[in-house]
Amino acid sequence: MARRTKIIATIGPASEDEGTLRGMIEAGMDVARIGLAHGSLDEQVQKFQMVRKVSSDLGKHVGIVVDLPGPKVRCAPFDEGGIDLTEGSQISLGVEGSESSSDFINVDYPNLLQDVQLGDSLSFGDGQVVVIVEEREGDRLKARVVHGGRLDGRPGLHVPSDRLRLSSPTDHDLTLLDTFVELGTDMVAVSFVRSAHDIRRLGVEPAPRGPMIIAKIETKAAVANLEGIIEASGAVMVARGDLGSEADIEELPHLQKHIIQECIALGRPAITATQMLES
């Protein structure tokens, strides 16, 4: 019997050599995801071309989805090795520089102090670390860690989407989109979609003349506008990491099931993503 459920795998630092990629394809990878939030454009183009080459060498068609960064707020990089934050400890946040440390986290969002309110819960990564904002001190926010963990690299910072003054897709997204449409990408995933208008702003030919557009459902606004988003898209992704930062954890399985059922009713493929190997 043919396998109807397809496997999407992200091509990252551990899998971007030809040998590993070949093994992933032989093991059953149907679609390679290339996340555009990290690395240079040249590096991502090289990954794209490598997937095409290896799949061609194996005589197998492997789809490629490029995942646009979207208006994601990210921390400035930590020192090599990262930091460990323990429950009950205090951390400061601001927008002052290009590096983060064990007691001060810089963020690449200029409106952080205006958009975040006292009492807000902010999560780093996909919920690895959660803090509560307790006070303002000059041009800094002071927050207490309520769920400790490790941070390294440039983790995302989840700010409540109803106050985030950023739209999707961003100008940078549209520039990246042009590059990968020209290269012939099969699919494009759009981050932090809030309405069908965000999908229409891409301005690309719909599949099959252009790439399939995948709307990532990761905000409360997207859930509220779900039917219109599904109708405007070629497929939908349940992005459980950021969606789980906006919804209570016990609500997430019900939201996931609801989104998938709506996709089935409207005849669109549904993708479940984030921490699949840990769940």
Model features per residue range: what roles?
Residues 1-279:
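Non-catalytic helical/linker scaffolds that mediate oligomerization, partner binding
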